[in-house]
A protein has these predicted regions:
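Membrane-interface micro-motifs in multi-pass membrane enzymes
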Residues: 107-150
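Transmembrane signal-anchor helices characteristic of membrane glycosylation enzymes that use polyprenol
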Residues: 10-36
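Short hydrophobic/aromatic helix or loop-helix immediately within or flanking a transmembrane segment
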Residues: 52-83
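Transmembrane-helix motifs of polytopic, lipid-linked glycan transferases
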Residues: 81-106, 114, 144
């Protein structure tokens, strides 16, 4: 099934595996503590002022997510967990190129690749709420953009160059 996720055609084992991965990533997100510096500053009124004034840096979208996640543990868990689940899924969608049979193995390999990244990289991105908002969420948005570009090109509606 080209173009769609095809969840209706998945076996119950595949669906259970994907739901298990989602629960796993939500648990990891729930377990990530707030840092005692950046995350607490973003969670205070000062962090909101920084974002509204754009006075800290020019990462407006990332800072928006950092402020939202630092103000609410529920938002943090949902944004981080869903993003952690979605990045390997979108990577798999890009790599599978419409071959639904390949999606699950590629998803598992992509998840393994992300989970096995060096601890130093993990600490600066996935285990730091502000860093996650500034670096990982934009990665998800970039993957969405790539999928949209692929859909346009595959439909033949637009030429890129």
């Amino acid at each position: 099934m080209k173009g769609g996720v095809g969840l209706s055609k998945r076996s119950s084992a595949e669906t259970a595996l994907l739901l298990g991965a989602l629960v796993f990533y939500l648990y990891i997100a729930w377990s990530v503590p707030y840092s005692t510096t950046d995350d607490l500053q973003w969670g205070m009124d000062q962090g909101l002022r920084w974002w509204l004034q754009g006075s800290l840096n020019s990462r407006y979208v990332g800072n928006f997510f950092a402020v939202a996640m630092c103000h609410s543990p529920l938002v943090k868990t949902l944004v981080m967990g869903l993003t952690m689940f979605a990045i390997p899924l979108l990577m798999a969608r890009l790599a599978a190129r419409g071959e639904e049979r390949s999606l699950l193995p590629i998803y598992l390999a992509s998840s393994a690749g992300l989970l096995l990244m060096p601890p130093v990289m993990w600490q600066e991105t996935y285990a730091w709420v502000s860093g996650f908002g500034n670096y990982v969420v934009p990665t998800l948005l970039f993957l969405v953009w790539l999928l949209l570009v692929r859909r346009i090109v595959d439909r033949g509606g637009h030429r890129l160059l």
